[in-house]
A protein has these predicted regions:
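Acyl-donor (CoA/ACP) binding surface of acyl/acetyltransferases
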Residues: 1-30, 66-178
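Polar/charged alpha-helical tracts
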Residues: 20, 46-54, 58, 176
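Conserved GNAT-fold acetyl-CoA-binding loop/helix
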Residues: 30-54
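Secondary-structure boundary/capping residues
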Residues: 31, 57-61, 123
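Short gly/ser-rich anion-binding loops that grip negatively charged ligand groups
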Residues: 38, 42, 61, 68
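A short helix-loop-beta-strand connector motif used in the catalytic cores of GNAT acetyltransferases and
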Residues: 53-66, 75
């Protein structure tokens, strides 16, 4: 998959040869980035290669899409199969690229492609206080579905039983909106 998002941005499938892009993109992050089922990065070469291998949709992994400006990875989108006919969409954008429409373009384009290729229900989990993500969801055609108490993990530690959890708002993509 390779889509032109305009403004010198492309959304394309991440491939095994993209390990160096993942390393460079997440190297300045102070905390792991969450565009998949588990926090990702900052990466070593081995960790980036392992992540790309694990994200193989043919093996049941997520569809990982890079948001590139030229040859620089500025963000990513993960389409994670949840149940048959259901896909969670998660996204991450470099801090210096936030607020520039990068996420809006990718989060609007990815479900349109996914609805054509993988007819599914596509949804976002958003922390209730995350105002930028709530505005983005509304702007690009998602509708609020429900609030789930203590559903989303904070990923402060590896052990789920010791980690803290918070409420999540579920927003579902409406292909007829936006």
């Amino acid at each position: 998959m390779d889509l032109d998002l305009g403004d010198d941005l492309r959304l394309r499938s991440l491939a095994p040869g993209d390990a160096a892009l993942l390393i460079e993109a997440t190297s300045a992050e102070e905390a792991p980035s969450l565009w998949g089922a588990h926090p990702a990065g900052p990466y070593s070469l081995a960790a980036a290669q392992a992540a790309l291998a694990a994200w193989d949709p043919a093996a049941g992994g997520q569809f990982s899409l890079g948001i590139l400006r030229g040859q620089r990875l500025v963000g990513a989108v993960g389409l994670m199969p949840d149940n048959p006919g259901s896909i969670e969409l998660a996204y991450w954008v470099r801090p210096e690229e936030r607020g520039k429409g990068v996420a809006s373009r990718a989060v609007a384009a990815a479900p349109l492609w996914a609805h054509r290729e993988l007819p599914s229900r596509i949804w976002l989990e958003i922390e209730p206080g995350n105002e930028p993500s709530l505005r983005l969801a509304q702007r690009v055609g998602y509708r609020f579905e429900r609030r789930i108490s203590q559903h989303c993990r904070d990923w402060a530690c590896e052990d789920a039983a010791r980690d803290s959890w918070h409420d999540c708002l579920i927003w579902v993509h409406d292909p007829g909106a936006a």
